């Protein structure tokens, strides 16, 4: 699996510039002595990937086991876990192949390695795109459940959810394949960045609107009990903290990766950008960390899911 310098290869040429743009392999005198490069050992990549792999496998198995969890909301959560599982699994596979090649335990022809690398790139890219899509889908689902509560079950039906899920997977595979094929075009990188920003804005708008509605509801209840300010302010503060954590984790884990893509287009040869490019492995590790955090935010808060998880762990099928 191709490694450029100290950086692993992901999504074809993402850790290098497209052929139409000068390479990111900046000399030491270009990047300067002040560059901070965070080294991510292969062992850490494997550890993070395996933790995420096991965690998301448990989520998928738990939802599959309990028929009460086969609602549209849990279908989206299950698909998010599957996407995160593929992100982690592809990186575990790539890291394992790199280590085997470096140790001389695996010998393969360059053409074979190139094909394997392309397949892993497509899997990684499609799972990342689908993960972002399902994060947005979960936000939309929760928004409808709050603002259209009486009509929720007629709007978000299981057949519609399945069609949406199928469309997301097909679109993710299709666009990731096109991306790998045309990764030397800056327009492709810009499309990915715009897509990330669109998902971020969508989630922020929906969750902020949901928080505002929840605060209004709490304020109305407080007025009935003549305890307006303490209850309302306490609820609003708790909701704001929760929202900040949710969106903050999303931005901190995904933002650096898409900043990397943006800088490839804007300043491929600038020394400061070159310093940022050196930390590609760190950005990838943050995405894997997000795959570890997602189940804690979206899945394990459910008592029904936690109860079923205990059954899965005790093998009581």
Curated annotation (Swiss-Prot):
GO terms for biological process: adenylate cyclase-activating G protein-coupled receptor signaling pathway; regulation of metabolic process. A lipid is attached at residue 315 (S-palmitoyl cysteine). The chain crosses the membrane at residues 38-63, 73-93, 119-140, 164-183, 192-211, 241-266, 280-300. Residues 64-72, 141-163, 212-240, 301-317 are cytoplasmic. Keywords: Cell membrane, G-protein coupled receptor, Glycoprotein, Lipoprotein, Membrane, Palmitate, Receptor, Transducer, Transmembrane, Transmembrane helix. Glycans are attached at residue 29. One of its GO terms (molecular function) is melanocyte-stimulating hormone receptor activity. The keyword Magnesium does not apply. Pfam families: 7tm_1. It comes from the Eukaryota. GO terms for cellular component: cytoplasm; plasma membrane. It is found in: Cell membrane. Residues 1-37, 94-118, 184-191, 267-279 are extracellular. It is a multi-pass membrane protein. Signal peptide: none annotated. Belongs to the G-protein coupled receptor 1 family. PANTHER family: G-PROTEIN COUPLED RECEPTOR. Interacts with MGRN1, but does not undergo MGRN1-mediated ubiquitination; this interaction competes with GNAS-binding and thus inhibits agonist-induced cAMP production. Interacts with OPN3; the interaction results in a decrease in MC1R-mediated cAMP signaling and ultimately a decrease in melanin production in melanocytes. Receptor for MSH (alpha, beta and gamma) and ACTH. The activity of this receptor is mediated by G proteins which activate adenylate cyclase. Mediates melanogenesis, the production of eumelanin (black/brown) and phaeomelanin (red/yellow), via regulation of cAMP signaling in melanocytes. This is Melanocyte-stimulating hormone receptor. It comes from Pan troglodytes (Chimpanzee). The lineage of its organism: Eukaryota, Metazoa, Chordata, Craniata, Vertebrata.
């Amino acid at each position: 699996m191709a490694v450029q310098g100290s950086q692993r290869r992901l999504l074809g040429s993402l850790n290098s510039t497209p052929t139409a743009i000068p390479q990111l392999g900046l000399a030491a005198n270009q990047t300067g002595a002040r560059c901070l490069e965070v080294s991510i050992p292969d062992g850490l990549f494997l550890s993070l990937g395996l933790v995420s792999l096991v965690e998301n496998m448990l989520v998928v198995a738990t939802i599959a086991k309990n028929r009460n969890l086969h609602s549209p909301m849990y279908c989206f959560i299950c698909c998010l876990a599957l996407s995160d599982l593929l992100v982690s699994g592809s990186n575990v596979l790539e890291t394992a192949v790199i280590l085997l090649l470096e140790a001389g335990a695996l010998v393969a022809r360059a053409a074979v390695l190139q094909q394997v690398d392309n397949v892993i790139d497509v899997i990684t890219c499609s799972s990342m795109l689908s993960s972002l899509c399902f994060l947005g889908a979960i936000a939309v689902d929760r928004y409808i459940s709050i603002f259209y509560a009486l009509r929720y079950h007629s709007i978000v039906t299981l057949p519609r959810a399945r069609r949406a899920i199928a469309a997301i997977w097909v679109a993710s595979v299709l666009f990731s394949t096109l991306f790998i094929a045309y990764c030397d075009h800056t327009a492709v990188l810009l499309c990915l960045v715009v897509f990330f920003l669109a998902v971020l804005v969508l989630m922020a708008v929906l969750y902020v609107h949901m928080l505002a509605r929840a605060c209004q509801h709490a304020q109305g209840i407080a007025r009935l009990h003549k305890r307006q300010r303490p209850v309302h302010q306490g609820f609003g503060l708790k909701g704001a903290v929760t929202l900040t954590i949710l969106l903050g984790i999303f931005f901190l884990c995904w933002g650096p990766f898409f900043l990397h893509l943006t800088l490839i287009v804007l300043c491929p040869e600038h020394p400061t950008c070159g310093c940022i490019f050196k930390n590609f492995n760190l950005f990838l590790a943050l995405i894997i960390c997000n795959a570890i955090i997602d189940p804690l935010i979206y899945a394990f808060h459910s008592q029904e899911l936690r109860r079923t998880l205990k059954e899965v762990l005790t093998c009581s099928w």
